[in-house]
Regions:
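Beta/alpha (TIM)-barrel catalytic core signal, keyed to glycine-rich beta->alpha loops juxtaposed to Asp/Glu
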Residues: 1-143
Length: 143
């Protein structure tokens, strides 16, 4: 696999290899959403390749940056609606809800963090909840 390749870079490398690339490891989180619009996830979905998602929690920005307080508030509301154990679980559920079916990379060896990510698989996030989180992270309505 590769890491942080644009669709053009991925296609170029793939065209020169005698084997199929396994994945593209990319940053995906509510606080980092460009890949939802730049074709990266679309390309991987078209090729039936599951991306690996790094920094799902935004490298701590989600919890430490005042700019993301509205996002934290919305994540807390959705956590209550889903009966989730934490907003962290809701973030992982948000990533898992993407049609490209990303595989989150858990950047921690702490068992409680790994458990939160695994338990996110059981959350049944609605499309409306997903878009509310997207809107709260962006700070404006999603067209």
């Amino acid at each position: 696999g590769v890491s942080n390749f644009t669709p053009a870079q991925f296609a170029l490398l793939q065209s020169r290899l005698p084997f199929t690339l396994a994945t593209n490891q990319v940053e995906i989180s509510p606080v980092h959403q460009p890949l939802l619009l730049d074709g990266t996830l679309d390309q991987l979905q078209q090729l039936r390749i599951r991306p690996m998602a790094w920094s799902c929690l935004g490298g701590g920005r989600l919890f430490n940056d005042d700019y993301f307080q509205p996002l934290r508030d919305e994540l807390a509301v959705v956590a209550e609606e889903l009966n989730a154990g934490s907003i962290e679980q809701v973030v992982y559920a948000w990533v898992l809800r993407l049609p490209s079916q990303p595989l989150p990379i858990i950047g921690s060896g702490k068992i409680e963090r790994v458990r939160a990510a695994v338990e996110a698989e059981t959350l049944k996030m609605t499309r409306q909840q997903w878009f509310r989180i997207r809107k709260a992270a962006l700070g404006y309505d999603v067209p």
